[in-house]
Each structure stands twice: as structure tokens, then as C-alpha cells.
Amino acid sequence: QGGPVSQSTIPEHLQSFIRAVRNSTRTAPNVVLIGESRDAETLRGMIESAETGVAAYSTVHTRSVPETLSRIINVFPVEERLQVTVTLLSSLRLVVNQRLVPMLGGKGRVALREFLAFTPEIREVLLDTPPERLIQTCETLLIKYGQRMQDAAQAA
């Protein structure tokens, strides 16, 4: 009998992250958490999970919110990127970029976070943006509606 949390370890229980994502859809989860998404198949599975209403969380190693979008989209073959972009932007709700940096005085670290909530209005703007301007537009939206890393550093 399953409890409220089901965990699978790679490669002990399943061979890959994509198999974990696909396997999770059989259990009708509310939430899927994948440690790291770095290939097209894992990202495709995460996006598909989000499309079905599952809260899908993962890490993508990047240095900014716009770079995160770029990394996710550019992992896919060129011929798939437009459709992936539309699907991603339709299901995306929040991107957070975090860095741990030394505190002034050198005692400990502080988490600096850059984030942008993908509200319906922001998603609409990005969906109406030509693909070649998507990252630049995301940067503009981040400055206007999100929190940039520089702002987090100044507040810390």
C-alpha cells in the first residue's frame, strides 16, 4: 500500500530520470520532483506532466531566469523548438534561480534568488514574442515584474 510519498532512486529503482517521469504518470501523482533535468526526454516528460495538471519541479543549472528558458528550449532539436516553447510557456508558472554566496565578513553564506512568476499576462506576452526575441523579452519582463539577482544582492 502506497503512502503519501513515493520515491524512486536513479539507477537503483529506475534507469533514468525520463523513466522516473514516465513511471510517475502511472501513479496519478499530485507532484513530481526530478533532481535535475538536462536532456530533452526528461524535460519533455516534465512539461507533459505539467500539462496534465501535475506540479512538476526540477533543477536546471543556469545563471538566470532567461538563461533557464534558453537552456530548456535549446536542448530540443531545432525542428521541435517552436512547439516546445509554446507548450513550456503555456504550463510554466515560476522560474527561480538561486546562488549561495559568501556573506560580507566571510561568516556563512546567503541565498540570493532571481525569480519571475509566469502570470497569464506574462505568458501571453512571451507567447506573442518572435522566437528570436524571447530571451531578450524575458529579461525585460524580469526587470519589470520579477526580482533580478542584483536586486537580491543589494537587499541581502
Model-identified regions with their sequence ranges:
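Short, flexible helix-loop junctions that flank or precede catalytic/ligand sites
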Residues: 1-156
